[in-house]
Each structure stands twice: as structure tokens, then as C-alpha cells.
């Protein structure tokens, strides 16, 4: 059953999910949860260690099980990992249980936000070296091309390139409240 008070934030790494998420949750009076942190707590080890020791299939299985638990909750803002929507089962679970919001940023802005980060595997080459700014932007553009068709199936989209964080949270809060009112009205009319 779809809970309109279960909000899922999606978007590329650096789009603002971890920054906007807790502020949005506070604004709505909801709890905030980061899916990757929940997976780490369940597994008792980091995402990097899960991939290294158990493989991607084990990680994806944990991801789905964690989402199934979260799907039973209400009044929660959930920050999703950048690739979770590529899994069809996860995508359907998210779409059927809550409101999906895409925090959209351009490859150029994402590059500016991410180029000095050292903890992101996507910013390293196959040999482990740090990618150049141009290589980072190219990798982001390639991954966005692959992921964006799913991102764009979100219920709501918020562009995060040039907005201040507070303005983004205010705009998103208004969009969510309107969306929930419309959805509630539609559900009432269907009965």
C-alpha cells in the first residue's frame, strides 16, 4: 500500500540527498533515514566491505530486504543510493510504497561538488588513481545517461544546481504537501 508520508529521495551522488534529506524530514516532522547506513548497520560492515567480501549480489539482496522493512514505515524521508533504482524490484517497491523525488543536478555541478571527495569509488579509475576533473565529468554524464530514465519516473523533480539549501527544502516541502493533498483527494474520489 502506498504511504504518501514515506518520501524517497533519489539522484546522483552529490545531488543533495544527504544534505536536503534531514532538513526536509525536520520540516515535515518526519524521521530521516539513509538507506546505505541502514544496510551497513544490518550487515555490521561498510558498503565497500560488503562489495569486497560478499559481492554485489549480496549487497543488492540486503538493499531489497532493507527497503522492504522501510516500506512498512510512515512519516519518513529516505535517502536512496544512486544506483538503487536500477534494480527493478527495488524500483517497484519504492514506487508502490511512497513518493519518489528526484534531486536533479547537471554533470557540471555534480563534478564541482564531487571532484575533491576521496571516498567515492566512482571518482577512481580502474587502477585506483583519482580521476581528473574531465574524467569525473565524463563518468558522471555516462552514468546519468544510464540512470536518468528511472530518475525521471519520480513523482516530483527538484533542480538543485543553483538553489540555496534552505530554498530547496522550502520548495520541496511545498511540492510534497501539494502532491499529498492531490493524491489524498484522488484516493477519496476513487472510493
Curated annotation (Swiss-Prot):
A GO BP annotation: chorismate biosynthetic process
Needed cofactors: Mg(2+)
GO MF assignments: ATP binding; magnesium ion binding; shikimate kinase activity
Subcellular location, record wording: Cytoplasm
Keyword Protein biosynthesis set for record: no
Entry's Gene Ontology cellular component terms: cytosol
List of residues binding Mg(2+): 18
InterPro entries hit by this protein: P-loop_NTPase, Shikimate/glucono_kinase, Shikimate_kinase/TSH1, Shikimate_kinase_CS
UniProt-listed Gene3D superfamilies: P-loop containing nucleotide triphosphate hydrolases
Function: Catalyzes the specific phosphorylation of the 3-hydroxyl group of shikimic acid using ATP as a cosubstrate.
Family: Belongs to the shikimate kinase family.
Record's protein name: Shikimate kinase
Species this chain originates from: Chlorobaculum tepidum (strain ATCC 49652 / DSM 12025 / NBRC 103806 / TLS)
Name of the gene: aroK
